[in-house]
């Protein structure tokens, strides 16, 4: 299931899991806040979830995000 996400979507999810807000993620990735929101919407659709917390939890459960990398 990891391959279902683009590299950029994985980057966005990593920063979501670290607790960053959209504007902080945009700054880190050198993209617009609108683009961050678009990536999140795509992630929600692919994961069949409703919000960023559910998306991060699913990514951790699927091994897309390593908890050790967050700490």
Show where each model-derived region lies.
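Recognition helix of helix-turn-helix DNA-binding domains
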Residues: 21-54
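Serine/threonine-rich low-complexity intrinsically disordered regions
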Residues: 6, 32, 63-66
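Regulatory hinge/linker segments at domain boundaries
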Residues: 1-14, 68
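Hydrophobic residues on short alpha-helical segments
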Residues: 10-17, 44, 56
């Amino acid at each position: 299931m990891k391959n279902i996400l683009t590299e950029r979507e994985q980057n966005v999810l990593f920063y979501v899991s670290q607790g960053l807000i959209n504007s902080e993620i945009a700054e880190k990735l050198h993209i617009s806040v609108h683009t961050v929101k678009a990536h999140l919407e795509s992630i929600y659709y692919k994961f069949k979830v409703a919000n960023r917390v559910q998306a991060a939890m699913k990514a951790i459960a699927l091994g897309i995000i390593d908890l050790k990398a967050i700490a």
